[in-house]
Amino acid sequence: MSFKHYSQISKEDIPSMNIKNVNAFLRDFSISDDKEKPITSGLFRLKAGESLKYTYTYHEMKLIVDGSFTIEDETGQKVEAKPGDLFYFPKGTAVTFTTSDFGLGFFCGQRGEGEA
């Protein structure tokens, strides 16, 4: 079995998440063929404006690759996220993403395509 390669995904267009008043964008790039335990990876971008409030219905890892985010969960844990920071969001985590400029994250989640 051969591997798959996706060249320069950070230069690709990332469509809007279509959340009113929130400048959030997300694109799934690679999806596993495992129907029982799917894995999906891609890019998430947030631009300055309203915060994005999101509750994870799946487990996800997110690596900050550019810009910055303020990430706060329902327990009050708050981090000023910068490139190189890695996050694990367990299923059920309620989190708020905010940025004063923009942030870009690479994610890998235990979900199927388009299930974010």
Map each language-model feature to its residues.
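Conserved short histidine dyad/triad with adjacent acidic residue
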Residues: 27-30, 40-56, 90-91
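Short acidic-glycine-tyrosine-enriched beta hairpin
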Residues: 75-91
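Conserved hydrophobic/aromatic beta-strand scaffold that supports enzyme active sites
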Residues: 41-43, 61, 86
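Short, charged/polar surface micro-motifs in flexible loops or helix N-caps
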Residues: 35-37, 46-51, 68, 113
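A short, N-terminal "cap"/entry segment at the start of jelly-roll beta-barrel domains
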Residues: 1-38
